[in-house]
Amino acid sequence: MRRPESSPRIAEPEAALTGYRPSVIPYELGFNLLVLALDGAALALTGRSPRLAAPAILLWCLGVFLGVLAFGGQVAFMRAFFAARLASYAIFLHGPLCWIGLAWVLRRQGRAGGSEGGEEGSKPSPWAPRAALALGLLLACVGVDAFLIEPTALQIRRVQVPSARVQEPLRIVVLADLQTDAIGPYEREVLARIAAEEPDLLLLAGDYLQCWSHEDHERETLALQDALRASGIRPRLGAFAVGGDCESRGWEATFAGTRIQPLQGVAHVDSRIRIQGLSLGESFRGAPALPPTQQLRIVLGHRPDFALAPAEADLLLAGHTHGGQVQLPLIGPLVTLSGVERSWAAGEPTLLPSGATLIVSRGVGMERATAPRLRFLCRPELLVVEVVPSAP
């Protein structure tokens, strides 16, 4: 295996997160106390008369919206993510409490024949408490799945790519967006699953650690190195990594003492494979042009946006989007933070006009910092790409 050829180094953006630790707890506490008061007000209004249930719900929604704006705006860094975090508290914590409470109030009113004052015609529909209970339970179930189950429900996704440039199958495992602030049992399980796949190549697509402070980052870097060394991962043709949004200058030291080789430039593997590793900036703008070759041409970048520019390659691999982290039926990912099409960002293998195949991994981690830590209908994944000889 030849050492990577150097390419002109592009200044990487500094990770805005490392070393910055805003205190968001007071704003979270204040917001939740506000919504708790809104919960009580909605139940109290409905208790006066079933006719007030709809206005109470509207006032609750308005109060939550204004609360998200007021408290979310207090955090300057990653403000949109923090607003989403507050909204998730309202929807998945207070939502079930409020709707189940409304179901109880409406059921009691139905048994009593209406409001406590016995106002004529104020008896709720017999379906109202059932609908409120069903909605509350639905929100609770979605919340449990999104916050407690899916984030660690690791999936192995296998994609087969035919190519005339290989004479025998080549197994590539792509690890994207580990993006953790604490190396623990889940991260060690991910590494064990990689080792079990016995890959020919291991490619890492950026975003490895997302910690609040330099001290936390240093501690978790050592933990990641220990976990990698203990994992038994030994790709036959090597392991290569590129930087992502969470990495700052000097990120290459993350893999010191491990089998993983940071790559910005070109590596020729076993004379049959050319891997082009992109800097973060290049993964946004496009891959630099390279001379023609008969080798299998792989381009590895963090963001998939480089696929929008022409690239002389057979296989384009990226991460960054997390598959959206939240997907809805018939809609797909709600947010991708990328300029590529939603289906690309969601991970669907795409044959580009150039003949290259683009595959974006949903990643194994999730957004940290002030963002809500959830996945919904978008399980974390290890991507296993089998490049096989194409039929003659």
What are these language model-derived features?
Residues 152-155, 165-257, 261:
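Membrane-embedded segments
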Residues 250, 254-259, 264-308, 371-379:
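Binuclear metal-dependent hydrolase catalytic cores centered on His/Asp/Glu-rich metal-binding motifs
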